[in-house]
Swiss-Prot record:
ZXR-1 and ZXR-2 are two shortened peptides derived from mauriporin. ZXR-1 sequence consists of the 16 N-terminal residues (FKIGGFIKKLWRSKLA), while ZXR-2 has the additional residue difference K36L (FKIGGFIKKLWRSLLA). Both peptides display distinct anticancer modes of action. ZXR-1 could translocate into cells, target on the mitochondria and induce cell apoptosis, while ZXR-2 directly targets on the cell membranes and causes membrane lysis. The variance in their acting mechanisms might be due to the different amphipathicity and positive charge distribution. One of its GO terms (cellular component) is other organism cell membrane. One of its GO terms (biological process) is defense response to bacterium. Amphipathic peptide that displays potent antimicrobial activities against a range of Gram-positive and Gram-negative planktonic bacteria with MIC values in the range 5 uM to 10 uM. In more details, it is active on Listeria ivanovii (MIC=5 uM), Staphylococcus epidermidis (MIC=10 uM), Salmonella enterica (MIC=5 uM), Pseudomonas aeruginosa (ATCC 27853) (MIC=5 uM), Acinetobacter baumannii (MIC=5 uM), Klebsiella pneumoniae (MIC=5 uM), Escherichia coli (MIC=7.5 uM), Salmonella typhimurium (MIC=7.5 uM), Pseudomonas aeruginosa (ATCC 9027) (MIC=10 uM). Belongs to the non-disulfide-bridged peptide (NDBP) superfamily. Long chain multifunctional peptide (group 2) family. This is Mauriporin. It is found in: Secreted; Target cell membrane. Keywords: Antibiotic, Antimicrobial, Cleavage on pair of basic residues, Membrane, Secreted, Signal, Target cell membrane, Target membrane, Toxin. GO terms for molecular function: toxin activity. It comes from the Eukaryota. Residues 1-22 form the signal peptide. It comes from Androctonus mauritanicus. Expressed by the venom gland.
Length: 73
């Protein structure tokens, strides 16, 4: 191989190593927290919590958890 090819391989390898070494769990968790799916789940959770709080405050009858019907596969 000529020197230019070796130099390109070296730089690419260094970039890959830099990316692997910079990977941190905190950054990964931060990306998950900001994802669209997480935002939808948090919004749904807040909505359910508000509904539950309103039922408790207003003294509404507690609903029993319905037993799920057969699950489709």
């Amino acid at each position: 191989m000529n020197k230019k090819t070796l130099l390109v391989i070296f730089f690419i390898t260094m970039l890959i190593v830099d990316e692997v070494n910079s990977f941190k769990i905190g950054g990964f968790i931060k990306k998950l927290w900001r994802s669209k799916l997480a935002k939808k789940l948090r919004a749904k959770g807040r909505e359910l919590l508000k509904d539950y709080a309103n039922r408790v405050i207003n003294g509404g009858p507690e609903e029993e958890a319905a037993v799920p019907a057969e699950r489709r596969r």
